[in-house]
Amino acid sequence: MNEKQTSYNYDEILACGRGELFGQGNAQLPLPPMLMFNRITDISETGGPHDKGYIRAEFDITSDLWFFPCHFQGDPVMPGCLGLDAMWQLTGFYLGWLGEPGKGRAISTGEVKFTGMVTPSTKLVEYGIDFKRVMRGRLVLGIADGWMKADGEVIYKATDLRVGLFKEKAD
């Protein structure tokens, strides 16, 4: 039995953005500048608080990132929605990594709390997605809780992140 890869470097993540990792028409990450992490450090089908699997990733922060000059001029901060989107991106990646077919789409989240900010002085953002359930039916649906850390401190939490994989309808 082949072991699944448990970490991905930037070039491998970009290959996913081009549709080369899980095959055309299947889970795909956005390409830069919307790709919100540089590497996936760990991914597993088991473990995490619910023992349903998890994914961990990191994003190197530099003062020249595209969003700092425009959000906000004179008061640069990473938009909170980009951190939330990163959590959805990772949830969809996990479903593709499981071998499930279909194109990933964010569906919803339960609750989101922002308790801190990412500024140009931040060095490292870490993401954690802990799966609660993966449902396989007409669509594949992943449900997970997520967190985001800035330089080691949890600053975002999201519950019940939902991402679906949708198959193309036959004509």
From Swiss-Prot:
Record keywords: Cytoplasm, Fatty acid biosynthesis, Fatty acid metabolism, Isomerase, Lipid biosynthesis, Lipid metabolism, Lyase
Catalytic activity field: a (3R)-hydroxyacyl-[ACP] = a (2E)-enoyl-[ACP] + H2O; (3R)-hydroxydecanoyl-[ACP] = (2E)-decenoyl-[ACP] + H2O; (2E)-decenoyl-[ACP] = (3Z)-decenoyl-[ACP]
Source organism superkingdom: Bacteria
Protein's UniProt keywords contain Isomerase: yes
Any GO molecular function: (3R)-hydroxyacyl-[acyl-carrier-protein] dehydratase activity
Residue positions of the active site: 71
CDD domains: FabA
Chief place of localization: cytoplasm
Record GO cellular component, one term: cytoplasm
Pathway where it operates: Lipid metabolism; fatty acid biosynthesis
Matching NCBIfam families: fabA (TIGR01749), PRK05174.1 (NF003509)
Protein name per UniProt: 3-hydroxydecanoyl-[acyl-carrier-protein] dehydratase
Organism in which the protein naturally occurs: Allorhizobium ampelinum (strain ATCC BAA-846 / DSM 112012 / S4)
Source taxonomy: Bacteria, Pseudomonadati, Pseudomonadota, Alphaproteobacteria, Hyphomicrobiales
